[in-house]
């Protein structure tokens, strides 16, 4: 009778070990996929990320927003001329060079406005160049080698039925948690790119305010926002690099319980730091 019970226990232990190994293997596979997507997404320019969306945003900017920006620029330059005249003792000391200065400023402002999209893309090209140069530094991965999986299976097979069942429940629940965390990572990374497109679509309006001292703060803050969201990708890449180093230490650890909880803990930490990259980048560049 005892050998029947022992056989049933061994059969249940085999099922639980297979289930735990399947959950653990899939758990790290999801982590690898998410980390790989982050590194790929932040290293992509707005034009390459989605050609259809990029074309639509450019058409909206040039056909709907640019005419409004032209009207705003007209008012700004008219106000600038009035200010220049008033500053010279209420028209009592008017020099012809003032008008040449105003014409030159207007010419430069019009040139900037007509090349708004190229200037915006140049900002992101600079940030993407920095990101791509930094991407080669990340050499660590989170892949589990067959030797590590074999050692984990050996440890699991030596455990009793009760701890195995508890570990299987933990691995199952944590796998569901990791799916939710992967969704959060997706939202953060894709949300950044959507924010880039939204900033790009309205670019002509803040560009039109740059020539005047009183309204120029709007354009200056817009420039800071462009650099902030561009270099946010570098901060995201740094977070992924730190995460890859941390996760590698638990991926090669022989303790299955620690590997599971360590993985979910570091992934929660990654999500938290990814959320902070946006505000950190804006504080660094002084935009609000």
Locations of regions flagged by a protein language model:
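Alpha-helical transmembrane segments of helical membrane proteins, especially in multi-pass transport
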Residues: 174, 178-210, 224-246
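Membrane-embedded alpha-helices of multi-pass transport/permease systems
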Residues: 75, 120-123, 127, 184-187, ...
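Membrane-water interface regions at transmembrane-helix termini and the short interhelical loops
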Residues: 81-94, 182-186, 214-215
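Hydrophobic alpha-helical transmembrane segments
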Residues: 67-79, 196
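Gly/Ser-rich, low-complexity
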Residues: 1-72, 88-97, 107-177, 216-221, ...
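Hydrophobic transmembrane alpha-helices of secondary-active transporters
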Residues: 78-85, 203-213
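Elongated alpha-helical scaffolds
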Residues: 102-105
């Amino acid at each position: 009778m005892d050998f029947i019970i022992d056989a049933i226990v061994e059969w249940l232990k085999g099922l639980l070990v297979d289930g735990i190994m399947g959950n653990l293997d899939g758990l790290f596979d999801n982590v690898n996929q998410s980390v790989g997507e982050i590194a790929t997404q932040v290293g992509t320019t707005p034009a390459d990320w989605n050609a259809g969306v990029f074309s639509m945003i450019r058409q909206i900017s040039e056909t709907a927003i640019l005419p409004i920006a032209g009207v705003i620029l007209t008012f700004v330059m008219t106000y600038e001329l009035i200010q220049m005249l008033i500053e010279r003792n209420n028209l009592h000391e008017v020099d012809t060079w003032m008008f040449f200065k105003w014409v030159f400023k207007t010419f430069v402002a019009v040139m900037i406005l007509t090349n708004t999209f190229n200037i915006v893309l140049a900002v992101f090209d600079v940030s993407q160049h920095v990101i791509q140069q930094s991407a080669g530094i990340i050499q660590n991965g989170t892949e589990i080698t067959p030797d590590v999986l074999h050692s984990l299976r050996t440890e699991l097979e030596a455990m009793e039925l009760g701890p195995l069942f508890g570990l299987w429940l933990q691995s199952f629940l944590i796998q569901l948690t990791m799916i939710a965390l992967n969704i959060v990572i997706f939202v953060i990374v894709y949300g950044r790119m959507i924010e880039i497109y939204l900033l790009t679509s309205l670019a002509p309006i803040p560009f039109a305010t740059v020539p005047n001292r009183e309204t120029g703060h709007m354009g200056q803050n817009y420039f800071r926002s462009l650099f902030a969201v561009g270099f946010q990708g570098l901060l995201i890449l740094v977070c992924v690099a730190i995460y890859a180093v941390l996760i590698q230490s638990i991926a090669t650890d022989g303790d299955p319980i620690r590997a599971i909880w360590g993985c979910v803990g570091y992934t929660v930490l990654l999500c938290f730091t990814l959320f902070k990259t946006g505000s950190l980048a804006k504080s660094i560049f002084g935009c609000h």
